[in-house]
Amino acid sequence: MQPVPSDPNYGLLRSLFQDPNNQCCAECNSANVPYVCIKLGVFICPTCAHFLSTLGFKVRPIMGSSFSEEDISRLQSIGNLVSKQFWLARWTPMDIVMPPPEDPNLESFLRLKYIEKRWTSSLSTSDGFSSPNNNNTSNVNNINNNSNHNNNINNNNNNINNNNNNNINNNNNIINNFSNINNISNGMNNISLNNINNNNNNNNHYNGNDIGIPIVHKTQSQPQPQPQPQPQPQSQGFSPFNSPRSSPKPGRHHLIDDLISFNPTPVNNSNNNNNNNNNNNNGNNGNPLKFSGGIPQNNNNNNNNNTTTTTTTTNNNNKVPFDPFSPIKTFSESGEYQNTNGNQQLSGSGNSLIDILSHPTQSKSPSPSGTPHSLSPQHHSSDFKVHLIDIPTTQQQLQQQQLQLQQQLQQQLQQQQQQQQQQQQQQQSPISNPFTSNNNSNSEPLVSILDKHEDLHNHHHHQQQQHHKQQQQQQQQQQNGNNSPLAQFNQIQQQQINNNNPFVEEKQPHQHPHHLQHHRHHSTSSINHGSNGDLASISLTLLTPSPSPSPSFNYSGGVSSAPNNSLNNSCNGNNNLNNGMLNFSNLNIGGSTSSACSTNSSSNITIANNINSSNNINIINNQNNQNNNNNNNTNNVMISPSPSPNPFLPTPTSTNQNNHIITPIPVNPFTDNLQLNSNNIRQHPQQMYIQQQQQQQQQQQQQQQQQQQQQQQQQQQQLQMQQQQQQQMQQHYQQQQQQQQQQQQQQQQQQQQQQQQQQQQQQQQQQQQQQQQQQQQHINLSSSAPLQSVNHSPIPLQPQHSSSQYMNQQGYQVYPNVGNQPQSPQQIQPQPLQQQIFQQVQQQQPQIPQQSPQPLQSSTDEDQSVLEVLNLKKLFDMNMMDKEEFEHRRRQIIDNLTKTTSPIHQQPPQPPQPVLPVSAPAQVPQPHPPQQQNGPTVPQQQQQQQQQQQQQQQQQQQQQQQQQPIPQPSSSSPTPDARLTGTERVIRHRFDAKLGKWVQTATIVITEPTPFAEGAMRKAFRMKDLSAEGPSSQMVAKLFKDSNEDRMVYFKDVEMQTYSKEIAERFNLKSPPKKIDFVPAFVMELVERQGKPFCAVEYFIEGKYEKHNNNFGYKNDYDRNTPQAFSHFSYEDSGCQLIVVDIQGVGDVYTDPQIHSADGQGFGKGNLGIEGIKRFFSTHQCNPICHYLGLSSVNPKPANDESGTMPRPPSIGQSYVRPSAFPPNLQQSFSFNFPPLKDHHVLEQLNQQQQHLQQQQQQQQQQQQQQQQQQQQQQQQQQQQQQQQQQQQQQQQQNQQQNQQQNQQQQQQQQQQQQQQQNGHPPPQTPLPPTPQQKDKPKIEVFGDILRKLVS
């Protein structure tokens, strides 16, 4: 990932990004960190960047972004490690478990941190800390304690007095006068030290306050200017870290000034040269101060013999710009300290505190980030090192301090009473928190919050035990009195170190001296420095390591009166100076100490330098002071500096005696340290959280394993169940097969039995037939048979194999022979007249397959045959059929009655041979006695010969067809239609094309119930008009197969055929070679039927029925000229508005046409509009008749093609004159007018013109749509206005419509003029534009007038 290469801060940003501590997200520990949040000063992953952006933080990507110096300083001062340690000090996994990186609950966790401020709710400002106040000072008043004191100080170099307890009297009033301490944090807390007076009078104990000792300061220390804090916007989210603008980075000498920023009363110290050869009792006086992060392992006993006492003054306006999240500067701006004495220069050996502060050396500890020094920033979060300071203090300095304090006691006794009163008032008032703001807010201090989470949690179980041990030790000390107080102090102090320090192993107390002391009840100790000590007046009570990266100073303004103070002040002239480890990242600053036990500091580890003095102080330089050298600090295990190493792990020290720099081991607290195997290391809450997660994962794995085992068991059970089911299914299937086999065997047996029975029955039937045929007599039918009042049509079905001129030859059907009879053309039995007889026939039909056909044995069958013959004779007498058809049908009835014919397979139909009729049976029912008919008879000899031949054929075929199924003849026969049966009265509707209306007349008709032909949509029935005579009485009724068809369809079809007839008449006026005509059609309303149904009726046409074209471009193979020319003529005759197609009929007499209109409206379902017109011309070829009529040439036939009808030569080339007027109703159906067409040579130009017209029409339509939209908008605006405005709009719309109409009329007139000028009319090859033509309705004229106009 590379930012902008041209960025001047590119190198710093690169080193920050390559830091291992910044490689993981500061919020979720994800490995991908392509984003940064400048406000928080951390590197984050894309998921956390998204969540933080939703919470109001500004997030920017590293790739392609530029960073200012302030942004880089922000990232340097904080970084991911500081941020993580800050939150770990406040948050524990026991409170709320941090979600993993991919968990959606991570957003709610971040919301708790930054929006709801769950763990930082006690902070006063949006940054989590109180705002800085540069002028805020707190005065620490003089704390005076009245007591009896002795001024006798014996400076004897030879006396040895180790029993100081006998000479301990009431202590002097030692006043620690602090005034005008201006401690200014770097934007964190305003530190105010309140006046607290703690008096504790114990017998035989030192009772006094901390001794105020003058400190060496810079004489001309200028206050550093503090930048004004900039208010942060509230919408950008909460940040616990301050802006780098208000956080100056102090150097090392500034940090020391912060610790010694007290202004005690100046004391004139005498320059006394004391020879201290062996003055390192319980102290490391020869150790140089180095900011090395630890304490050297061995002590140097060589001390400086000459010490100089200097008097310095401090600036009251001294400021402490300390940023807890900023690293310590490695080099000060001034470069060195100035010596205020002027008489003696500072030591240049580099071993003193001043030399190191004035000439700092670069730390030799390796950078944890591994970044080269040239690329590493000056202040980096990973290079944040907190150094431990060794405080060199000698006995001579102690004596000088005591002398100065005794001189100050006299001056301070006068002010004691006033101070006590002030102290009492302050004790009654609540103690202010030094880390809270001046607004008296209840927010909890930062350092106490940081220490309280971890230290209380880890060391709470030590409190009761330590308190009990301390009480026992105090009681024993009081009982013993003056018996070896130094030994008691050393033992008790060592026990306290071993018990109170959680970082020192309890099993090895001898390795850890008494330099560590834990104060759980706010007991304090004073570090008394010599006159030449640079940190002489610092009273450091608690220097506690904390898991928080923030500092924790604890300035004690008074000494607690707890019993432990006696232990701290019980040494006789011994310095008891331990190397106090000053962890500047964990300094606990306290305004005062109290005698009450406080849990806020019970977990703090106090590392104090206790200097015990009494009124009679014997300072011994030469003798017996070496006895206390056993208390030197050797093999120290130091507390790890924060924040780089883990504060819960010990820091190994270097064994190099020359170089006292202790290199801290960088330990990442967020990762497991597998190399540390110590048993006494205290477990971090994060490690506990990791263990909990591991336990949860193990439990989840166990649960998953259990679930998998359960699933496997379930699957096994399912497999077993499936196998059992399959076995059951197989058994069941086998049983079913066995049952089926048994059933089949039984059926076969039954069939064999039935066949045997049928054979016996057939033999019996043959014998009976022979007997009956011998007894039959011939019945002669005559035309004088009485006519009965029949209500139904007697017309039987025309046989399909007959050669009648009225039947279509394509519907021939052959059936297999029935029973053992010889094969003959199977004839469909005629249907009875009455409905009852028809039902009886249907009931008898299922018995035919079971038994072979038998001759008629009952009187019912004979009656049916007789009635059919009588009805047939009646129709013949009424001239409804000719003699040939009559004879054919009569023979059919006789053949069906006698069963003497058989069908012939796969042979074309042959004309029937003249067969004499067979006499009807003699038995005739009484109600209808049969009448004999005059006609020829058949001799009995011929009849016997035929019977013998039939018997022989039956015997030959009987064996082959015994098991063949017998078909039902009635199943293939058309069923009669109940709508057309018998004779009835009807109303005939005839359309008059001249008048354009329907005319109704009443008549009587007789129809047959069964159709003689069927089409795709309709059935054809025979009908006769009894009111007419001759051929006009023969008609055909056409009914739709769908009884729910709309009635108006019949009227539309008749109307369309009437229009075609009118166009055919105009076609005949052109004198074509053959004239054409359309059969007149009517609509019959059957008023006597239920529901009064309608049917289309037209005159019957005799001859061969042919179809020349259809409504979708079909053309007959013969391609006659006249029908095709008529369709072409109808298109141009109608002004290119319609075309007549679907020409079919007999000869040139056509019927059932179809009309395509340009608008696609009207003329029934077959009207295909423009598409139908295009289909016709796609297959049409202009023939000579088209040229004769003067029609436009479209795909003309070759000139040498002389097939078809040819017109007369003189008439070729004549132009067709369109009639001036059309029938009124026909004119109404023409809703579009097509533009004139030119010759076929300019068809391409026409196509272009048509396309141009189409584009114009589209533009017009678009304009109209736009106008409509504008009108709609206007209407919406106008609806809100008054009614008057609405009326005006309506008038405007009317005017627009009138203008449009006028424009359309003008266009139509122009088009008509162009049509008259042009002669050619070729049909279009592309879709014609639908330009409507509105014509005025002409007056109704007589057909004769129209003919006159046409002729003229």
From Swiss-Prot:
Bias (Basic and acidic residues) ranges: 1334-1352
Region (Disordered): 123-164, 219-380, 424-445, 457-484, 503-560, 619-658, 786-863, 901-979, 1198-1234, 1279-1352
Biased composition (Basic residues): 458-470, 510-523
Domain Alpha-type protein kinase, first and last residues per copy: 990-1194
Paired cysteines (S-S): none
GO MF annotations, alphabetized: ATP binding; GTPase activator activity; myosin heavy chain kinase activity; protein serine/threonine kinase activity; zinc ion binding
GO cellular component: actomyosin contractile ring
SMART domains: Alpha_kinase, ArfGap
Coiled coil, from the record: 393-429, 689-781, 1241-1320
Entry binding sites for ATP: 1164-1169
Key word Membrane present: no
Domain Arf-GAP, first and last residues per copy: 7-127
EC number: 2.7.11.-
Residue ranges with Low complexity bias: 268-287, 298-318, 619-636, 821-859, 931-965, 1279-1319
A single BP term in Gene Ontology: myosin II filament disassembly
Zinc fingers (C4-type), renumbered ranges: 25-48
SUPFAM superfamilies xref list: ArfGap/RecO-like zinc finger, Protein kinase-like (PK-like)
Polar residues: compositionally biased ranges: 237-246, 329-352, 359-379, 799-812
Domain of life: Eukaryota
Biased composition (Pro residues): 906-915, 1321-1332
UniProt keyword list: ATP-binding, Coiled coil, Kinase, Metal-binding, Nucleotide-binding, Serine/threonine-protein kinase, Transferase, Zinc, Zinc-finger
Family: Belongs to the protein kinase superfamily. Alpha-type protein kinase family. ALPK subfamily.
Protein known as: Alpha-protein kinase 1
